[in-house]
């Protein structure tokens, strides 16, 4: 299972939010590129970047910061936040982003997701950010009536390569992943699912291994890395491709 460090960018700085609340942001580094290099040095094989300003504004805001990171490192990067039209996604992929993450448009313009998946096969990820099973949009500032499972199934049919599932109530809280919701989603779609939100310890990461046979192929870790609750190198050793043993699928059931 791939351990993917998250770098959330707000006003050009590396921050973490609490439950997606822009009013509860904590700056961890003024220079996200330094953070990116640190995660690469610790063994990261992929980075997850979120343009928080972009998510709120509906357009890419921190493009220059993202480009600096891309020029600094040699591992794949996936980016989300404010990607709501073909031109914005195209520009992002042109500068070297491997995969673009769509959120709001999956709910508001599902036909655009189909178009983007056809234009950029294998490069479109759909981020499903859920609050009590319902999908949140526009930088988590609004909650729709769309069910997360139904959206996941629809996006898989439209050609999404992967789904990132974030439980908003757990994001930035270090309260552990929502295993039940992840299991339900993974069982309902035929494409890989990446877990996000709430990771607080190696135990949390190990608990996700029980879902790997269902298609949960990665986990995004944010606050726990920044507070030191999780050491990236240790996490990769514990659940990554080089781990020394598998955890039985029913170990944490």
UniProtKB/Swiss-Prot annotation:
Question: From the record, what ranges are coiled-coil?
Answer: none
Q: Which GO terms describe its cellular component?
A: cytoplasm
Q: What is its EC number?
A: 5.3.1.16
- For the keyword Repressor, the answer is no
What top-tier enzyme class does this entry carry?
isomerase
**Pathway the protein takes part in:** Amino-acid biosynthesis; L-histidine biosynthesis; L-histidine from 5-phospho-alpha-D-ribose 1-diphosphate: step 4/9
- Do you know which CDD domains this protein is assigned to? HisA (cd04732)
Q: Where is the active site?
A: 8, 129
Key words, A-Z: Amino-acid biosynthesis, Cytoplasm, Histidine biosynthesis, Isomerase
Q: Which GO terms describe its biological process?
A: L-histidine biosynthetic process; L-tryptophan biosynthetic process
Q: Which GO terms describe its molecular function?
A: 1-(5-phosphoribosyl)-5-[(5-phosphoribosylamino)methylideneamino]imidazole-4-carboxamide isomerase activity
Q: Classify the main location.
A: cytoplasm
Compartments, as annotated in UniProt: Cytoplasm
Q: Which family does it belong to?
A: Belongs to the HisA/HisF family.
- By its UniProt entry, which NCBIfam families does this protein fall under? 1-(5-phosphoribosyl)-5-[(5-phosphoribosylamino)methylideneamino]imidazole-4-carboxamide isomerase, PRK13585.1
PANTHER family given for it? 1-(5-PHOSPHORIBOSYL)-5-[(5-PHOSPHORIBOSYLAMINO)METHYLIDENEAMINO] IMIDAZOLE-4-CARBOXAMIDE ISOMERASE
HAMAP family annotated for this entry? Answer: HisA
Q: What protein name applies here? A: 1-(5-phosphoribosyl)-5-[(5-phosphoribosylamino)methylideneamino] imidazole-4-carboxamide isomerase
Q: Which gene encodes it?
A: hisA
